[in-house]
């Protein structure tokens, strides 16, 4: 595990953390019960198997 050699200032720490940005999930179309929905790719199998119900 990486260990810092020197202490990082509060200013540098906050500037570094401020660069992180959340990205929107890539939505893909999936048809469930005759209704086409746009859902995140990793949830498509759950919708197809019926583990998640579409909220319309």
Swiss-Prot record:
- Any Pfam family matching the protein: Ribosomal_L32p
Molecular function in Gene Ontology? structural constituent of ribosome
Q: Which GO terms describe its biological process?
A: translation
* Keyword ATP-binding in record: no
Query: What InterPro entries does the annotation carry?
Result: Ribosomal_bL32, Ribosomal_zn-bd
Give the disulfide map: none
* Gene Ontology, cellular component aspect: large ribosomal subunit
Spell out the residue ranges making up region: Disordered: 1-22
Keywords (A to Z) from UniProt: Ribonucleoprotein, Ribosomal protein
Q: Which superkingdom is the protein from?
A: Bacteria
Give start-end positions of Basic residues composition bias: 1-19
The answer to keyword Repeat applying to this record is: no
Give the family from UniProt: Belongs to the bacterial ribosomal protein bL32 family.
The protein in question is named: Large ribosomal subunit protein bL32B
Q: Which gene encodes it?
A: rpmF2
